[in-house]
């Protein structure tokens, strides 16, 4: 429960309160006592004692006409019968009010947050596995792939980083379930849309940066994308960063000026990988030792080193790190199937140019024969990925490419595929039915030297079409049908 008086106090303290508007009159304080027993931004879940948040570009006045709620919070006075708390920024208001409503659960958990263009989910699972070794399985996880609030039951995540109200509720549930630590991915959109406003993380990790999510719906420029991701730095008590990442200089400069304790990793830093072979690697620095992970590729080993440094800052021992990394399983990341002819089928969530480039390089290194890539690109977001995908394909002439559908949403998947192909000088294959594309790819293999890469969806069991999730068998099940 939270009192209206508390809500007003929170907003005033954040310089985010304009007035209360009711029946044509304006108030700087409310003369009556009001208690809210629920917060919501979904009109279908609102009740008579709910504090409702009217947010979103498409919010309409008619949503409030028959709304069952006590008050609503908005940047705009809709002049309806329901009293309104008018604010400058409704998303910031929701974040701070939710934190108070749920009794500041973020202060009772040890939190580790990860950002970067690629590797967030893999690193999140690495970190959870290490911390579980340290705390006996009491680590909650919020990732692109899955969410768990009790360490046992997992469910599919709707967003990489949930809306602030949902996020604070999840943190509170994790505490109730006995969790002591939380590992979560923080997207650039989370900072752009204030989903993590007011949160300070115990440890923040910045893995890498490359152009992605650039377009009219998400970030207009790379600068905006990078700036939003960089907000994790000033909202972390300790920070881990990749010294080999693009634009590292400003990260280093900002950390120094803000006097934030930190650790760097990479070839030109104290913490580095000095030996790498298959699933095994050796590190030097503050977490020096020999480690094994279940994923191929040096980039995965670099993510493991990043999480080793981050979890060490939370108290994990070298033994915890060693044992956790060895056991970590990441759903939808380089998931491996073997066809009857011995060919390998790799299923991976790689959904931007940098992730695809790293994935292709690893598979090329281990397979000398036919390499078939099944790939699509999302509609109505991340438009810059199409050029990036085309450039990766052009760079790797060994790839036999089948372009297909991947969450085309309100765009024509053939137009998306054509755009990818426009950046490639050789002829590509098209099969817009994703399952048939996978069938065709597997049929092209003959021996253990051959491999198929199915990129983009990982464990997703839906296709986004016209704004709705439509059932899809899933890449793994589709591939298994034709092994």
Curated annotation (Swiss-Prot):
ATP binds at residues 116-122. GO terms for cellular component: cytoplasm. The modification N6-carboxylysine is found at residue 229. GO terms for biological process: cell division; cell wall organization; peptidoglycan biosynthetic process; regulation of cell shape. It is an enzyme of class 6 (ligase). Keywords: ATP-binding, Cell cycle, Cell division, Cell shape, Cell wall biogenesis/degradation, Cytoplasm, Ligase, Nucleotide-binding, Peptidoglycan synthesis. UDP-N-acetyl-alpha-D-muramoyl-L-alanyl-D-glutamate binds at residues 43, 160-161, 187, 195. Disulfide bonds: none annotated. Its main location: cytoplasm. InterPro entries: Mur-like_cat_sf, Mur_ligase_C, Mur_ligase_C_dom_sf, Mur_ligase_cen, MurE/MurF_N, UDP-N-AcMur-Glu-dNH2Pim_ligase. Catalyzes the addition of an amino acid to the nucleotide precursor UDP-N-acetylmuramoyl-L-alanyl-D-glutamate (UMAG) in the biosynthesis of bacterial cell-wall peptidoglycan. This is UDP-N-acetylmuramyl-tripeptide synthetase. It comes from Lactococcus lactis subsp. lactis (strain IL1403) (Streptococcus lactis). The gene is murE.
């Amino acid at each position: 429960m939270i009192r209206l008086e508390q809500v007003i106090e929170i907003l005033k303290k954040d310089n985010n309160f304009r007035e209360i508007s009711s029946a044509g009159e304006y108030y700087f304080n409310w003369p009556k006592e009001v208690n809210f027993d629920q917060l919501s931004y979904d009109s279908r879940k609102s009740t008579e004692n709910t504090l409702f948040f009217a947010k979103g570009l498409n919010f309409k006045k008619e949503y409030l006409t028959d709304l069952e709620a006590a008050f609503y919070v908005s940047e705009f006075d809709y002049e309806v019968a329901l009293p309104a708390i008018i604010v400058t920024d409704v998303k910031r208001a929701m974040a701070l009010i939710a934190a108070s409503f749920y009794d500041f659960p973020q202060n009772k958990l040890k939190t580790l947050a990860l950002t970067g263009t690629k590797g967030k989910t893999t690193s999140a699972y690495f970190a959870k596995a290490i911390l579980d070794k340290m705390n006996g399985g009491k680590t909650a996880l919020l990732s692109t792939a899955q969410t768990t609030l009790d360490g046992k039951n997992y469910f599919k995540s709707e967003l990489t980083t949930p809306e602030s109200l949902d996020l604070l509720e999840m943190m509170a549930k994790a505490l109730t379930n006995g969790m002591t630590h939380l590992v979560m991915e923080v997207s650039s959109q989370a900072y752009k849309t204030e989903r993590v406003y007011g949160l300070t993380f115990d440890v923040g990790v910045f893995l890498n940066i490359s152009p992605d999510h650039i377009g009219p719906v998400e970030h207009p420029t790379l600068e905006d994308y990078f700036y939003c991701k960089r907000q994790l730095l000033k909202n972390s008590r300790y920070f881990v960063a990749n010294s080999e990442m693009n634009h590292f200089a400003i990260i280093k400069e900002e950390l120094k000026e803000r006097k934030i304790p930190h650790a760097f990793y990479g070839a030109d830093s104290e913490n580095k990988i000095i030996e790498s072979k298959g699933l095994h690697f050796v590190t030097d620095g503050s977490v020096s030792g020999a480690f094994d992970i279940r994923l191929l590729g040096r980039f995965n080993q670099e993510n493991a080193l990043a999480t080793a440094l981050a979890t060490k800052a939370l108290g994990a021992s070298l033994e915890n790190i060693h044992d956790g990394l060895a056991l970590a399983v990441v759903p939808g990341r380089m998931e491996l199937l073997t066809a009857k002819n011995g060919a390998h089928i790799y299923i991976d969530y790689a959904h931007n140019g940098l992730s695809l480039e790293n994935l292709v390089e690893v598979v090329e290194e281990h397979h000398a024969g036919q390499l078939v890539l099944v790939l699509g690109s999302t509609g109505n977001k991340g438009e810059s990925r199409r050029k990036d995908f085309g450039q990766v394909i052009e760079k790797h002439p060994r790839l036999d490419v089948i372009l297909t559908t991947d969450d085309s949403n309100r765009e024509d998947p053939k137009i998306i595929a054509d755009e990818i192909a426009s950046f490639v000088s050789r002829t590509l294959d098209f099969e817009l039915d994703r399952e048939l594309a996978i069938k065709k790819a597997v049929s092209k293999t003959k021996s253990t030297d051959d491999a198929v890469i199915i990129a983009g969806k990982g464990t997703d069991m839906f296709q986004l079409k016209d704004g709705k999730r439509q059932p899809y068998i899933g890449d793994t099940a589709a591939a298994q049908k034709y092994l």
